[in-house]
């Protein structure tokens, strides 16, 4: 049966998603929303997202590496200075017009910018706020200033021990030592679950009005 215009519309056609200075996990989560039709705006620092310049085997286009080209697909792009209050104001205006926020900045940083969940919810009660962090939003490590990275995600998950746990007696062979999983495994898994969580929250909001 041929689809009508309404039936062929992407599920998230009417959703807007600013993606605030995220790492690889944020890009993966936002990519899921974009694939479902959300208008997704990626916010980058003035010099560009550092992940633009990651190019294994020097594979890329016009100075942008293949991983970024893949995971930042289906986006609009804007540059903002996170250290400039004027940039905070622009991001806040974007956030207040959005349905979903995706960020990997620490809760303290977002609060200082006036873009934390509680602040935004006061003006936009139905907003879905996806905050991704290796250290979480609460607990003793939440405010750690160490830069978030895929290898930290993997190490804290315990995943590398599955790949290279030493076997038998004596010193381990190189291939038996705990080993980083290939690609951005930590970021991919975190981003996938984050994206699915945002979709679930949008569904809940649509069903309950909350």
Language-model-detected regions and their locations in the chain:
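Glycine-rich phosphate-binding loop and adjoining beta1-alpha1-beta2 segment
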Residues: 35-77
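Alpha-helix N-cap/helix-initiation motif
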Residues: 22, 83, 183-187
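Basic/polar N-terminal segments that are highly enriched at the extreme N-terminus
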Residues: 1-10
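Glycine-rich nucleotide phosphate-binding loop and flanking beta-alpha elements
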Residues: 24, 47, 86, 108-110, ...
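A structured beta-alpha segment of the ubiquitous adenosine-cofactor-binding alpha/beta core
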Residues: 18-21, 63-122
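Active-site-adjacent "lid/gating" segments in soluble enzymes
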Residues: 32-36, 97, 111-210
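Hydrophobic alpha-helical segments in the ANL/AMP-binding
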Residues: 28-31, 65-69, 195
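Conserved small-residue-rich beta-alpha loop and adjacent elements
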Residues: 9-48, 55
């Amino acid at each position: 049966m041929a689809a009508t215009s309404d039936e062929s519309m992407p599920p998230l056609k009417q959703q807007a998603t600013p993606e605030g200075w995220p790492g690889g996990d944020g890009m993966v989560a936002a990519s899921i929303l974009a694939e479902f039709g959300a208008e997704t705006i990626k916010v980058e620092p003035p010099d560009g997202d550092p992940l633009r310049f990651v190019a294994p085997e020097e594979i890329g286009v016009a100075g942008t590496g293949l991983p970024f080209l893949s995971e930042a697909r289906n986006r609009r792009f804007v540059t903002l200075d996170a250290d400039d209050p004027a940039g905070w104001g622009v991001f806040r205006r974007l956030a207040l017009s959005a349905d979903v926020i995706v960020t990997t900045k620490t809760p303290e940083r977002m609060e200082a910018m006036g873009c934390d969940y509680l602040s935004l919810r006061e003006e936009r009660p139905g907003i879905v706020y996806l905050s991704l962090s290796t250290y979480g939003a609460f607990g003793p490590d939440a405010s750690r200033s160490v830069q978030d990275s895929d290898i930290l995600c993997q190490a804290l998950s315990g995943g590398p021990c599955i790949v290279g746990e030493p076997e038998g007696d004596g010193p381990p062979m190189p291939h038996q030592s705990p080993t980083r999983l290939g690609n951005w495994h930590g970021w991919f898994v975190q981003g996938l679950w984050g994206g699915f969580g945002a979709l679930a929250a949008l569904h809940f909001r649509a069903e309950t009005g909350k």
